[in-house]
């Protein structure tokens, strides 16, 4: 499938819903755990001269250790492999220069999207000419290739970001939400914490045994929605239009939710208080079996 009978998607071979994806695609992908540079190095040892590129998001919610990204860069260079950053989410959100600039690690190629156009349909694959020139020998087509509105819009968006310091504003507002949320959770002795970054955070709910609790998360989201706060999948991405009043309203709603949850008796299940069906996991990324939760 795909134009001209050509189709390739490394990510489709990684997810749990992979019906129809040839097994050889999976065999071409080696997965390592984030922040495990030793594991990545072992992959290079076991697949000497066979690794074309390392592809990763420089960060999602787990923060990179002090030397992780630098070690990944070193391993790529030592093995003549490309380092490719997926900055579809982090680019133009964490920093105007993306995580490359934030963590001072230069990738060979970087993918951008979403934030650079403020909702307009645009994305970009970037890199130096020594790598980008190979696109001249490939047939790359896109429905929106001749569409110039998004290009003009993106230039305006980036100029606005520079002039109004929008990213710094989002970090500042995000810190108030992030810290305020976790303070409330601690005050009510509930393991309902925001993890990640003030600019990109998500709810992590755990039961008394420190296991992830989807039931508790579903209940939190339900009670927040009742008060006009919609946290899609428990995630929060701050944007420039969010105000301090929005943060105050969100935190007040969360405190009301905590009060409600604390009234639930120990022998009662969170699921009992759901007014709809329990959410179900539709798909998941393939990750190493030793993957641990983080905070």
What are these regions (language model features)?
Residues 174-178, 185-221, 272-291:
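Conserved PLP-binding catalytic core of the aspartate aminotransferase-like
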Residues 39-43, 56-82:
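Active-site core of PLP-dependent enzymes with the aminotransferase class I/II
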Residues 149-168, 206-208, 241-245:
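Amphipathic alpha-helix from the class-I
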Residues 41, 137-147:
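A short glycine-threonine-serine/GTX helix/turn-capping micro-motif
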Residues 78-80, 188, 227:
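Helix C-cap/helix->beta junction micro-motif
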Residues 1-52, 175-178:
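PLP-dependent aspartate aminotransferase-fold enzymes
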Residues 162-164, 223-295:
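PLP-dependent enzyme catalytic core of the Aspartate aminotransferase-like
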Residues 103-135, 146-153:
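Active-site PLP attachment segment
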């Amino acid at each position: 499938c795909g134009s001209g009978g050509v189709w390739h998607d490394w990510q489709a071979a990684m997810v749990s819903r992979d019906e129809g994806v040839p097994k050889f695609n999976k065999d071409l992908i080696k997965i390592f755990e984030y922040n495990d540079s030793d594991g990545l190095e072992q992959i290079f040892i076991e697949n000497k001269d066979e690794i074309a590129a390392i592809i990763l998001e420089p960060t999602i919610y787990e923060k990179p250790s002090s030397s992780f990204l630098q070690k990944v860069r070193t391993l790529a260079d030592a093995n003549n492999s490309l380092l490719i950053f997926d900055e579809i989410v982090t680019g133009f959100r964490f920093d105007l220069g993306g995580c490359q600039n934030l963590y001072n690690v230069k990738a060979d190629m970087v993918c951008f999207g979403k934030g650079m156009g403020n909702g307009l349909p645009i994305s970009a694959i970037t890199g130096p000419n020594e790598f980008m020139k190979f696109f001249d020998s490939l047939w790359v087509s896109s429905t929106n290739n001749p569409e110039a509105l998004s290009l003009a819009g993106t230039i305006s968006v980036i100029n606005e970001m520079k002039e109004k310091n929008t990213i710094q504003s989002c970090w500042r507002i995000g810190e108030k939400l992030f810290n305020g949320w976790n303070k409330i959770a601690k005050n009510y002795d509930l393991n309902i914490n925001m993890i990640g970054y003030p600019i990109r955070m998500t709810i992590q709910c755990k039961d008394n045994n420190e296991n992830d609790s989807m039931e508790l998360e579903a209940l939190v989201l339900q009670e927040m929605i009742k008060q006009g706060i919609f946290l899609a999948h428990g995630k929060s991405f701050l944007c420039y239009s969010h105000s301090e009043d929005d943060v105050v309203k969100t935190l007040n709603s969360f405190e009301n939710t905590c009060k409600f949850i604390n009234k639930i008796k120990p022998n009662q299940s969170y699921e009992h208080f759901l007014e709809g069906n329990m959410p179900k996991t539709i798909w998941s990324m393939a990750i190493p079996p030793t993957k641990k939760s983080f905070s």
